[in-house]
Design a protein with these regions (language model features):
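Short, intrinsically disordered low-complexity segments
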Residues: 12-14, 38
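Bacterial N-terminal signal peptides
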Residues: 17-29
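Preference for long, amphipathic alpha-helical scaffolds in soluble/luminal domains
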Residues: 33-395
């Protein structure tokens, strides 16, 4: 990885491109995500993916058209299947495109959530019914859930109702039974980025308290405070972010969604009236927005070191992961007026170009679908839903 945006010698660029092409071949075998059309070479893609020259700022109309092309292909041109992929990959597709996201089962296309909620088999989707609610088990590797409440957080971001039925070991439960288990599984030191999303989305009023497995009283604000760190210790807060999964973006996304949900239930509270964990979350979010903008590369890509420092890379996968995850966070954290600023438009344009140039490459699922989710959120917030989204909702 290079930490500089200066021009790289041609020989070094070629060597990095060759190394990447080998890595991408192995990535297709181990972590590829969907059957993409064949053709083209990774070499041509890579030498443009890390180009240091300043990127033009697309017009709003140009960007909307580019977004729609990229999202249409990513949703429908890349197809995942129950035979080739596990819950870790398939649920990332749901994260990007919502509860109607379709996958292959044999020769047929099925709705991923309908399939698994009906109790049909999906590798890595392992639920256990307990007296304290339905628990999604954590599993090693990229098969099953990798973090507490990850599956439920994905589902919650698409406003799937808590009354939705879900079959576990032949018995019918409801999504709220998973929420109940999330409330029970709170303790000091828990990685709560996904729990913040779940509980801030489903609990009304958001200020309610409950007793968790540790026998102590908990609230959404207490979970948020644990994730955000000390209110006025910005160095400690930055360290918490930088040490977290995917450059801190998941922690920040959890904080941003929770704060958005709190504001939705308390529109009378202005930013300068926030207190406790909500104020700490606000401070961490504003810090990260500044870092993302200050460390952005001339190409429009966000730093491959996320919020720590400026960094560029010859590795296409690193750019996809960093810019995709960072845009996803910003799309939750920024209002429409700020998302429409040139610096964000350049990042969106960069990400669209990267995905257009890699249409023939079977990309790693996590980076691909977090990037797609960021683009979906941006498209919806700045321009409104795509026509295909409106048609699906109408049906």
């Amino acid at each position: 990885m290079s930490d500089s945006s200066h021009e790289t010698p041609a020989s070094a660029r070629f060597g990095a491109a060759v190394a990447l092409s080998v890595a991408l071949v192995h990535g297709v075998i181990l972590t590829g995500c969907g059957d993409a059309p064949s053709g083209g070479s990774g070499l041509a893609v890579q030498t443009t993916a890390a180009a240091p020259q300043p990127a033009p700022t697309p017009t709003p109309d140009q960007l909307r058209e580019q977004l729609d092309r990229v999202l249409e292909f990513t949703e429908h041109g890349r197809v995942m299947s129950l035979e080739k992929h596990a819950a870790w990959q398939l649920l990332h597709g749901v994260l990007a495109f919502g509860p109607n996201f379709r996958i292959k089962s044999g020769d047929q296309m099925v709705v991923a959530l309908d399939w698994v909620f009906a109790g049909k088999p999906m590798r890595g989707w392992t639920l256990t019914a307990t007296e304290y609610g339905v628990k999604a088990e954590i599993e090693p590797g990229k098969l099953g859930q990798g973090h507490d409440d990850q599956w439920l957080a994905i589902i919650s971001q698409w406003q799937v109702p808590a009354t939705r039925e879900i079959v576990v070991a032949g018995q019918t439960y409801r999504l709220r039974d998973m929420v109940k288990r999330s409330m029970y599984d709170c303790w000091n030191g828990k990685e709560a980025s996904w729990s913040d999303i779940v509980l801030s989305t489903h609990l009304r009023p958001i200020d309610q308290t409950w007793t968790a497995r540790d026998g102590r009283e908990w609230s959404v604000e207490r979970l948020v405070s644990m994730e955000a760190g000390p209110i006025y210790d910005d160095d400690a807060g930055a360290e918490l972010i930088n040490m977290s999964a995917c450059g801190g973006t998941h922690r920040l996304i959890g904080l941003a969604i929770a704060l958005n949900n709190y504001r939705s239930q308390h529109p009378e509270i202005a930013d300068d009236q926030l207190a406790g964990g909500w104020l700490a979350a606000h401070r961490r979010i504003q810090w990260a927005i500044r870092q993302a903008r200050d460390f952005q590369n001339p190409s429009g890509a966000f730093s491959t070191q996320f919020f720590q420092r400026s960094a560029n890379s010859a590795n296409l996968d690193e750019h996809l992961a960093a810019t995709g995850h960072t845009l996803e966070f910003l799309s939750f954290a920024l209002p429409k007026s700020e998302l429409d600023q040139p610096w964000v438009r350049r990042a969106v344009g960069y990400l669209c170009r990267l995905l257009e140039r890699t249409r023939h490459i079977d990309l790693e699922c996590g980076a691909l679908y977090h990037a797609a989710h960021g683009l979906v959120l941006y498209r919806m917030k700045v321009y409104g839903p795509r026509e295909t989204d409106v048609a699906v909702a109408a049906n």
